């Protein structure tokens, strides 16, 4: 009998997305083995660290944040298509994850970005993982778009904020969606 493959989709959500670290730790404590991970925006950053075996290092870095550390990571830019360049954050990410290729992942991983030319999502599953995460996190207006193969890429949350469809396309039989944004509200009657 074939093992059921479990996919984990880590959604967008800005700083709330750090909660994905807790979701992963809880799944591990419950004995739920994830086979495939996909992420969008902050979910791609956390998901890539998890897929590459670097989640403890990322968690340690995040837990060390002070208010002032967060402010120091903000590198304002008025020229590159976004309020922030994002280089300080992603330089730190590169220190945590020095291996830059999807082939270094211990499990299949994919990131979702949005192609500005077509308005469609782009699934990034091979090549430069740093570029994929940077593109997936590039919130329009806040961070500059990322050039890739003649196109400009921005945050995957524009079109697919919780990429459960990507986990399915990568072979997951069952999908677990981790949602950290608060756009969903209870409807009062």
Task: Tell what function each PLM region has.
Residues 3-95, 125-135, 179:
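Patatin-like phospholipase
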Residues 13, 23, 43, 111, ...:
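Conserved small-residue
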Residues 38, 112, 174-178:
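Hydrophobic/aromatic beta-strand patches that form the interior of the parallel beta-sheet core
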Residues 70, 97-108:
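A short alpha-helix-loop-beta-strand transition element characteristic
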Residues 115-118, 149:
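Short acidic-glycine loop/turn motifs at beta-strand connectors
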Residues 127-172:
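ATP/pyrophosphate-binding catalytic subdomain of soluble kinases
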Residues 182-189:
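Conserved small/polar residues in nucleotide/adenosyl-binding loops
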């Amino acid at each position: 009998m074939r093992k059921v493959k479990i996919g984990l989709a880590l959604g967008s959500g800005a700083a709330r997305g750090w909660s994905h670290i807790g979701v992963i730790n809880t799944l591990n404590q419950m004995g739920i083995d994830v086979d495939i991970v996909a992420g969008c925006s902050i979910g791609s950053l956390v998901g890539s660290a998890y897929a590459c075996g670097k989640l403890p290092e990322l968690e340690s870095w995040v837990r060390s944040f002070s208010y002032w550390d967060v402010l120091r990571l903000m590198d304002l830019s008025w020229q590159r298509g976004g309020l922030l360049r994002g280089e300080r954050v992603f330089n730190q990410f590169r220190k945590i994850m020095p291996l830059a290729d999807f082939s270094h992942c211990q499990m299949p991983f994919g990131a979702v970005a949005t192609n500005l030319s077509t308005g469609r999502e782009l699934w990034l599953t091979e090549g430069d993982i740093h570029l994929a995460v940077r593109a997936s996190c590039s919130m329009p207006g806040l961070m500059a778009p990322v050039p890739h193969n003649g196109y400009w890429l921005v945050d995957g949350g524009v079109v697919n904020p919780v990429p459960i469809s990507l986990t399915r396309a990568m072979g997951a039989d069952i999908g677990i969606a981790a949602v950290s944004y608060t756009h969903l509200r209870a409807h009062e009657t």
